[in-house]
């Protein structure tokens, strides 16, 4: 769920939610601010499950309509940029008219009201920022995959200070991989980098 060269860690809960989506759903929506690993999570989960994936930005939603036979899963990023009712209706029609297709929607904002009818039918599943915060086990797995050796108790401090925010953990791992010890100066530098992200 995090971009650090090949270091990716995914919470088991997120994997289970995607499994349920593939078994019972048609729409999966991930809504969280930047830095929660929405795109990384979707790329990682879908690459193992599907061959025909079309990824588009919301401002190119009409591209998904051109040839639905060429994709099994349509990934629409930046859903928060859809501002016209015409684009909203276009996406809703695409979902309704293609019952054998899956749709993965990513947004930095709240779930738009115009997709709520799909939620009420039970066809839509979601992952929020709260779902994407790393727990201790996922964070440890991430640091291990990042080849960052943590001293006793360091993970506790990192989790306390970062709250498990994926971007913060990525920045901490990048600095620690360079040999910087975890502490207030690294935390301050990381906070500045997050602010500038």
Question: Residue locations for each model-derived region?
Answer:
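Phosphate-binding P-loop
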Residues: 19-25
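Amphipathic alpha-helical "lid/sensor" segments that cap RecA-like P-loop NTPase cores
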Residues: 35, 42, 126, 144-197
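Walker A/P-loop nucleotide-binding motif
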Residues: 25-42
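N-terminal pre-P-loop "Q-motif" helix
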Residues: 4-18
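Sensor-1/coupling segment of RecA-like P-loop NTPase cores
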Residues: 81-83, 93-121
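Conserved P-loop NTPase "ATPase switch" module shared by AAA+ and STAND
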Residues: 67-87, 106
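The catalytic "switch" region of P-loop NTPases
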Residues: 100, 112-149
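Conserved catalytic segments around the Walker B and adjacent sensor/switch elements
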Residues: 47-62
């Amino acid at each position: 769920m995090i971009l650090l060269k090949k270091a990716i860690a995914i919470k088991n809960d997120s994997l289970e939610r995607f499994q349920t989506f593939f078994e019972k759903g048609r729409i999966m929506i991930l809504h969280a601010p930047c830095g929660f690993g929405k795109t990384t999570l979707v790329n990682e989960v879908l690459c193992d499950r599907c061959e025909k994936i079309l990824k588009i930005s919301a401002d190119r939603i009409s591209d998904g309509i051109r040839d639905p036979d060429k994709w099994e899963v349509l990934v629409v990023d930046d859903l928060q940029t859809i501002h016209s009712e015409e684009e909203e209706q276009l996406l809703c029609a695409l979902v309704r008219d293609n019952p054998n297709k899956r749709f993965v929607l990513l947004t930095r904002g709240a779930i738009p009201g115009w997709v709520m009818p799909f939620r009420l039918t039970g066809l839509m599943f979601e992952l929020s920022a709260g779902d994407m915060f790393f727990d201790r086990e996922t964070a440890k797995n991430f640091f291990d995959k990042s080849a960052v050796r943590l001293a006793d108790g360091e993970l506790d401090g990192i989790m306390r200070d970062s709250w498990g925010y994926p971007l913060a953990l990525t920045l901490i791992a990048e600095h620690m991989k360079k040999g910087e010890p975890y502490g207030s100066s690294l935390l301050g530098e990381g906070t500045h980098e997050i602010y500038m992200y």
